[in-house]
A protein has these predicted regions:
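Pre-recognition alpha-helix immediately N-terminal to the DNA-recognition helix
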Residues: 22, 39-45, 101
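A short acidic, leucine-rich amphipathic alpha-helix
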Residues: 55-56
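Charged, amphipathic alpha-helical coiled-coil/dimerization segments
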Residues: 26, 49, 71-134
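Short alpha-helical elements of helix-turn-helix
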Residues: 9-10, 33-42
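C-terminal regulatory/oligomerization modules of transcriptional regulators
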Residues: 1, 124-147
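N-terminal leader segment of winged-helix/HTH proteins
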Residues: 1-31
C-alpha cells in the first residue's frame, strides 16, 4: 500500500491546494474572481498582451478554463480580446485599465497572505525552499520531456 502522507505528489498537491485556497479567499470573497480568472489577470499583468494559448501555458490552465475566464473577464470590462496583428486567425488578450486597477488592489493583499505563510520560515529556510522547488521542478520537466 501507499503511504499518502509520505507520497511527494500527494503532499505537494495538498500544500498547493491549501496555499491556493488561502490566497483565493482574498480575490474570491472581496473581488468575486474565480481562481482561473485571477490567474489570467495575473498572467496578463506579468507578461502583457498574449494569445490565449500562451495564457494557458503561463497559468497552467487548460484552454477551456482560459476561455471561460477570458469570457467572464471580458464581460466585466477587465480585459479585451482583439485580432492578432501577426496572425488574423488568432486572438490576443490584454488588460484594460479597470483590469490593471483591480490587479493593483489584489496584489498587495495576496502578497500579505504569502508573507504570512513564509514568515514561518527563517531566511535560510526560505532560500532552501526556493532551491528545492526549482530543483524538483527542473527534474519534473526533464521527466516530462523524456516521456
Amino acid at each position: 500500500m501507499i503511504d499518502l502522507q509520505a507520497f511527494l505528489p500527494y503532499r505537494l498537491a495538498v500544500l498547493s491546494e491549501a496555499v491556493s485556497r488561502c490566497v483565493s479567499q482574498v480575490y474570491g470573497e472581496r473581488f468575486q474572481l474565480s481562481r482561473d480568472e485571477w490567474r489570467v489577470l495575473a498572467a496578463l499583468a506579468d507578461a502583457g498582451t498574449m494569445k490565449s494559448s500562451a495564457a494557458a501555458l503561463h497559468t497552467t490552465l487548460d484552454k477551456m478554463q482560459v476561455s471561460r475566464a477570458v469570457t467572464r473577464l471580458e464581460q466585466d470590462g477587465l480585459i479585451q480580446r482583439s485580432e492578432d496583428p501577426g496572425d488574423r486567425r488568432n486572438r490576443v488578450i490584454e488588460l484594460l485599465p479597470p483590469g490593471t486597477a483591480l490587479v493593483r488592489k489584489v496584489v498587495p493583499l495576496v502578497e500579505a497572505r504569502v508573507a504570512f505563510l513564509l514568515d514561518a520560515l527563517d531566511p535560510a529556510e526560505r532560500s532552501s525552499l526556493d532551491a528545492v522547488i526549482a530543483k524538483v521542478g527542473e527534474r519534473a520537466q526533464q521527466l516530462i520531456r523524456q516521456g
